[in-house]
Amino acid sequence: MKRRQFIASLASATAATALAKTKAVASPLIGIQVAGHSLLDEGMERCLDTIQATCHANAIFLYSHSYYAAHGRAPELYADHGVPIRDERRRKITRVWLRHHPEAFKNTSLAMPEPTDEYGDRDLFAETVEACKKRGLKFYARILEPDTSKLTGRVANFEQGMSVGLDGKISAQPCRNNPQWMAWWDAIVSDTMKSYPLDGFQWGAERMGPLSSVLWKGAIPFCFCEHCETRAKREGINAARARQGFGELHAFITKLHAGVAAPSDGVFTNVMRLLMKFPEVIAWDYQWRVALEEQGQRVFKLVKAERQSAHVGRHFDHQNTSWDAIFLAQWSYADVAPFADFIKPILYHDILAPRLANQLAELKRGPLAELSLPQSLELFYSLRGYDSKLQPKLDELNVRGMDPEYVGIETRRIVDVVQGRCSVVPGIGVDVPNTALEAPNGGKRPSDQLALRAAIKNAFTAGAGGILISREYDEMRLESLKTIGETLKELGQV
């Protein structure tokens, strides 16, 4: 996008959303994330009865496409809602929950298949529109950007829209500079809004950039396709030096992961030395983020073009909101606000603790090798402004959750940054399981009810415009749903 086009789109989008943003702040959004199979397994009316009678949600957030979602969980990780629990691992459930118009995808070779798996014969979006309308519930579509593993065998020609690694092979992420991907993604958004009278559309991309991916995981750097190189040239970035810098950084991290002795002058020093020697690496990584935000700007404009009153939500996952310092530094929430009616940061206090343990272990193998794990944890708490006396110690990360102060601090941080330009609707984690290998208690992590109450209260005290009850309804115990409803009533939010 050229600079003058960007400025023009920014101005028009800001003007177009002033009214919508006022509404978003005035009326608390109490949403709940539901998977399509939950509505059908439990029965639409029964499921909505349960939701309204317990947590008092006023909005249903349903996947339009569940390519990237919580799939393949053991039955023990589902909550008992009074109906038989089916083993999802033995099922082949559709990943498309609505009906598309083929002509919407005329500008891309990525083919949207007809739903043929279990429940593929149901237009669940049409059914949910009617069910929500009768009950006075708002209905929002939600979608997470899929990756290579989720598209394989499901979307024909998807390879033509994916990133290309330094090794010349297809990478996990899509390339947001690739016209094929852009046309496919834009068609999904536009056709979804055109086809159904939705109250809103929430999208997210649970991604790390190329630099974070190398430093955290030792992943092969990306994207070096022709479209990214064209963009780099336009921005004055030397692609050859970016390739060289990423290559040397990847080789260094790979050796560390293989157990090669660290250099005598230190791992962190050598990482910084490479970044200073090759500033093109940081520039290349930044353009990855700019392209991601341009995708968000297109989503906003496409949704508003079809339905001006619809709310556009931006989902940021745990790595985006909490531990990926590079992602957080690249782009301020203030820069996101003009293209969102609300921002939904994942602030799942319970499950963050074991996830954080995994991230610290990965950093220990790479750029933070000189720090002990307790030192890294203390550094994280200090950088994010958390009280280490309240938060779990290293040996507690896998057995208890974060103190709910986490929810309040991160909500307030975003509220202060966006300054009323959009609403902040944090995702409150409810009974989210730990799906890591060898997780304690088989992965079950039932929410502490007092902590759940505190998390909700902290969110609203910090200025939240609502909450999004997360991660998935099928994981939420009735006890937790009732606790949420009672807390919201106590706060006067329902």
Predicted features, each with a name:
Residues 57-117:
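Aromatic-lined carbohydrate-binding/catalytic grooves of carbohydrate-active enzymes
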Residues 340-354, 400-413, 420-486:
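Substrate-binding cleft of secreted/luminal carbohydrate-active enzymes
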Residues 46-69, 195, 462-466:
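Catalytic domains of carbohydrate-active enzymes, especially glycoside hydrolases
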Residues 279, 311-320, 377-398, 410-446:
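Active-site clefts of carbohydrate-active enzymes
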Residues 140-144, 148, 202, 245-250, ...:
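Aromatic-lined carbohydrate-recognition surfaces of secreted/lumenal glycan-active proteins
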Residues 111-114, 140-196:
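Active-site-adjacent "subsite" loops/lids of carbohydrate-active enzymes
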Residues 5-24:
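N-terminal export signals
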Residues 72-93, 147-169, 206-270, 356-371, ...:
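Aromatic- and acidic-residue-enriched segments that line the glycan-binding/catalytic groove
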